[in-house]
Amino acid sequence: VVNAKPERLLFLAFPLSILYSFLRFIPPFRKLLQMDKIIKAYSQCDIVIDEAGISFVDSRGFIMNTYAFVCAAVPMLCGVPVVKYSQALGTFKNGWNKFLAKWILPKIKLICARGKITQDNLAGIGVTENVKLCADGAFSMPDSEFYAEKVQKLCEDSPFFRKRVVALSISSVVQGKCEKMGRDYRGCMIQFINWLNEQDYNVLLIANAAREGSEKPRNNDLIICTEVYN
């Protein structure tokens, strides 16, 4: 495991990878640049698989899209091919995002487009030759009999699951969008859950993204789930 925090990747590894792309054929310089753990790790790989669930999306803004660019650029500058595992990309209406995407994505060895919309977004900026339409990786994984049995036993032993159950995925992303529209997302979810309870349903709250111990809402639905539950 190599420490590749965003600031370290952007301000240290990225400049070094540019130098490495020119100097890696000269043994003394290659050895010197490989003193950086990120450069050394990437340069020893046969292939790098980018497992971002979503990247190069207008709504993610300058910082996140720049980070997505650097994540792909550093290993490529180290001479290692990059494959983008099944993920969502686009839209590309923002100028900076479109510039970065058009520059780096055609150079990716293979882009697994997660769904037809992503494929169309990529085609809209002329990226087609290295794109393959794929399903979501998580939904393509085989079920584990071991965990399926554990879940089944949990459901059988818990009184909660002896009634009809509705699972509700509370989203911090949707909450943020509702706030911009002046809508009370938390209140709406509470009202909906109360109605389900009145119809004799138990409600199971699911945090799609969870960062235990974090008080920040990004990639963390635990906060809004807790607010709704309380």
Where are these regions (language model features)?
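Active-site anion-handling motifs in enzyme catalytic cores
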Residues: V1-N230
